Amino acid sequence: QHPANFKQVLAGQLPHLGLLVSGGNTLLFEISTAGVLKVLAETVDDAAGEALDKGAKLLGIAYPGGPQVEKLAQQGDPHTFDFPKAIAPRNERRFSFSGLKTSLRYRMEKMTDAELEAQLPNICASYQKAVIDQLLGKTKHILEVESYQSIGLSGGVSNNKALRAGVQRLAQRYKIRCMMAQAQHTGDNAAMIAFAAYADPTGTNTSEVNIAPSLRLDQFC
């Protein structure tokens, strides 16, 4: 679910660490015991979902690319190709995915059409692994230096099985609760908006904001 009326929804689970991954946003945020939201890390260029879609487009995979990359990745070996996982040091709190797309293009330029077709599942598996490894690596670093009661995964890319499994492993490792929407609901924005209303039946959790297509999460929470 998208964050709304945090103190009610996350009762007993604060402080909370959230990973939001979609085609337009990639960020880590925390919700304090007082219910205050703070962005800890965000992408400096492409969002993770955007990187998956752009990679799919380079490979000639039909839109929506991300789910198709995941489907092909399940048939491939994620260790076949070594794509860069980040340009930033592991402890630097930012994401970057633009270099990953460039690396894929250079890799493709060195392959024949026949090689590309034969290696497509392995390319998708390796490319997806690079995206997910960066997401989980940054999340793991924050869990190592901060203390949380719960971790959450949201956004359209939270439907990705490998990412969901990775977040669940982190929750188990750090002995905290894992919170994420059921996979079938991860792409339904209407359901997320309805849940926000359900979590705040009195309508007190409001904010005066203008329409902004790329509004930051911490600008309205």
Give the positions of each predicted feature.
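Short beta-strand scaffold segments in enzyme catalytic cores
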Residues: 18-20, 26-30
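Glycine-rich phosphate-binding loop plus the immediately following alpha-helix
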Residues: 32-77, 101-102, 106-111
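A contiguous, well-structured pocket-lining segment that forms one wall/lid of small-molecule binding clefts
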Residues: 71-151, 160-174, 201-204, 218-221
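Glycine-rich beta-strand-to-loop/alpha-helix junction loops that act as flexible
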Residues: 22-24, 151-160
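Conserved phosphate-binding catalytic cores of ATP/NTP-utilizing and phosphoryl-transfer enzymes
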Residues: 1-16, 196
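Glycine-rich phosphate-binding/hydrolytic loop that grips phosphoryl groups
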Residues: 1-3, 181-219
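Conserved phosphate-binding/catalytic loops in two-lobed NTP-binding clefts
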Residues: 150-151, 168-192
